[in-house]
Amino acid sequence: MAQPSTTYKFELNLTDLDRSVYESVKQTIARHPSETEERMTVRLLAYALFYNEQLAFGRGLSDVDEPALWEKSLDDRVLHWIEVGQPDADRLTWCSRRTERTSLLAYGSLRVWEGKVVPVANNLKNVHIAAVPQEILETLAKDMPRVIKWDVMISE
C-alpha cells in the first residue's frame, strides 16, 4: 500500500520592503512520500520570495504537468511558473512556453547541472534562476517540525 502524504502547517509572517508587502499567511501543505525535506523547504522559500495572493502550491511530484508553485490569473492563464530543484533544459524550455514568467530555485550539487542547463536558460527571456546555498538549506530542513513558523524579511 502506498504511503500517504505528510501534512504540515505553515505560518509565514512576511515583510517584503522592496514590494511593500506585509502579510501574515497560514497554509496547510502536503509533503509527498518521495519528497525530501530539502525540496519542501525550497518550496516554502519560493512561496515567501514570490508571494502574492494568487500564488498557490502545485501538485508537484504527483503531477509532472504542474510546477512546485504557480500564479494564475482570474481567467486561468499561468502568469508565473515556479520550479525547484534541477530540471533539465527541455523541462525549463517547456515551462517557459506556458507562462509569462518562469523562476527556478535550484539546490543541491549544481556544478554539472549548471554546465548543461544554464547556457540553454540564458536564451530563454522569461526564465530566472537562483541557487539556494546548500548549507543554509540543510540548516532549515533539518528536523522539520510539522508546524512551521517563519518570519521572513526581504530587502535588496
Predicted segments — roles?
Residues V64-E66, R77, R97-T99:
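Short connector loops at helix/strand junctions that flank enzyme active sites
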Residues L55-L74:
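Long amphipathic N-terminal alpha/beta scaffold segment
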Residues L92-S96, S109:
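Short Lys/Arg-rich amphipathic alpha-helical segments
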Residues N52, T99-E100:
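Short, well-ordered alpha-helix to beta-strand connector turns
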Residues L69-E71, D76-R91:
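Conserved catalytic cores of phosphodiester-cleaving nucleases, focusing on short active-site segments
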Residues D16-L61:
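Acidic-basic catalytic patches of nuclease active cores, encompassing PD-(D/E)XK
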Residues A2-H32, R101-S103, S109-E156:
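Helix-rich interaction surfaces within compact, conserved domain-sized segments
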